């Protein structure tokens, strides 16, 4: 689409749109109405937000389970109606959120007299809260006891159990299960013509977001927006290439640079990493995020017990913060 602009009208054409938040179900569903947008920008922004919301937000999930007598995923569980495959499917649906800032930990479930076992029967934890307490986990025969230990880890998207090595978790005798970390369940959007005053004919973006309750839609959209903004900000360095720091969103203001410097000076505890990855990094004397981003992929893969899965975990977490491995930090002192 082309347009002839009068002098001084360029800024008006790309005026900042407004956002209206409509809550559909508190903590779970909401829609965001964005207008006015230049024609074509509704589709551009809608696609970008949808991709980030469905792929780049971190969350928590049960990634391994240990039951007395269980040695592999094909073992029978005495006194339990469900086989391990069905049990794993149910545990995959348990929604967790961190209440202490912890990025990993263990949960315990104990049943002494049989009956239906629900997720709200998981022992209370100082680190994690079960959001959907009404989820049926399994059915135990009368008079049969069941002891279950579950490993909780943080991550992105969906991780299959076959990609997890047994030495990547610290729960003895546990069997890994598929894990769904992303707190966003569904994202849809539509683009319509806006009727907002003088902007009639521009785009109106209606973004629908549904989460699992571990993160509310407003927070999810905010986090996704930060990720997109951080990644796009790298192009601002084109105007001042001599002061570019590889991978660091220098931005255009002193406050932006200070924010980046503060993040680099933070300890790696601020990152959502598994216990295994964190232990490997500590073994390499990597204490601060600055130490981590100055290493290359090859450097990390040389560390004992640090494999490709741990590497991808680190890269995704750094990406969500606008950082990357192999950064040149000379200009940060």
UniProtKB/Swiss-Prot annotation:
Gene3D superfamilies, alphabetized: 5' to 3' exonuclease, C-terminal subdomain, DNA-directed RNA polymerase, insert domain, RNA polymerase, RBP11-like subunit
Coiled-coil blocks: none
GO cellular component: cytoplasm; DNA-directed RNA polymerase complex
UniProt enzyme class: transferase
Entry keyword annotation includes Nucleotidyltransferase: yes
An annotated Gene Ontology molecular function: DNA binding
Function recorded in the entry: DNA-dependent RNA polymerase catalyzes the transcription of DNA into RNA using the four ribonucleoside triphosphates as substrates.
Stated family: Belongs to the RNA polymerase alpha chain family.
Quaternary structure (record): Homodimer. The RNAP catalytic core consists of 2 alpha, 1 beta, 1 beta' and 1 omega subunit. When a sigma factor is associated with the core the holoenzyme is formed, which can initiate transcription.
Domain commentary: The N-terminal domain is essential for RNAP assembly and basal transcription, whereas the C-terminal domain is involved in interaction with transcriptional regulators and with upstream promoter elements.
Protein name per UniProt: DNA-directed RNA polymerase subunit alpha
The species this protein was found in: Neorickettsia sennetsu (strain ATCC VR-367 / Miyayama)
Taxonomic path: Bacteria, Pseudomonadati, Pseudomonadota, Alphaproteobacteria, Rickettsiales
């Amino acid at each position: 689409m082309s347009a002839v602009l009068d002098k001084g009208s360029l800024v008006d054409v790309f005026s900042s749109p407004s956002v209206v938040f409509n809550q559909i179900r508190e903590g779970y569903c909401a829609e965001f109405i964005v207008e006015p947008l230049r024609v074509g920008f509704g589709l551009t922004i809608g696609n970008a937000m949808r991709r980030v919301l469905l792929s780049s937000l971190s969350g928590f999930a049960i990634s391994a389970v240990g039951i007395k007598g269980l040695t592999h995923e094909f073992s029978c569980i005495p006194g339990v109606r469900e086989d391990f495959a069905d049990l794993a499917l149910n545990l995959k649906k348990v929604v967790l959120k961190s209440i202490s800032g912890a990025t990993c930990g263990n949960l315990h479930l104990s049943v002494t007299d049989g009956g239906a076992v629900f997720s709200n029967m998981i022992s209370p934890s100082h680190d994690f809260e079960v959001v959907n307490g009404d989820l049926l986990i399994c059915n135990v025969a009368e008079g049969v006891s069941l002891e279950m230990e579950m490993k909780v880890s943080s991550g992105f998207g969906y991780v299959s159990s076959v990609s997890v090595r047994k030495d990547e978790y610290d729960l003895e005798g546990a069997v890994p299960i598929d894990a769904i970390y992303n707190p966003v369940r569904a994202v849809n959007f539509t683009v319509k013509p806006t009727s907002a005053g003088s902007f009639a004919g521009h785009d109106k973006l209606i973004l629908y977001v549904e989460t699992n309750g571990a993160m509310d839609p407003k927070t999810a959209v905010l986090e996704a927006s930060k990720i997109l903004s951080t990644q796009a900000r790298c192009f601002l360095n084109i105007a001042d290439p001599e002061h570019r720091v590889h991978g660091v969103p220098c931005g255009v203001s002193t406050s932006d640079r200070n924010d980046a410097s503060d993040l680099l000076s933070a300890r790696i505890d601020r990152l959502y990493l598994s216990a295994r990855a964190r232990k490997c990094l500590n073994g390499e004397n990597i204490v601060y995020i600055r130490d981590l981003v100055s290493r290359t992929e090859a450097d990390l893969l040389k560390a004992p017990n640090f494999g490709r899965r741990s590497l991808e975990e680190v890269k995704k977490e750094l990406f969500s913060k606008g950082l990357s491995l192999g950064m040149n930090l000379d200009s940060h002192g």
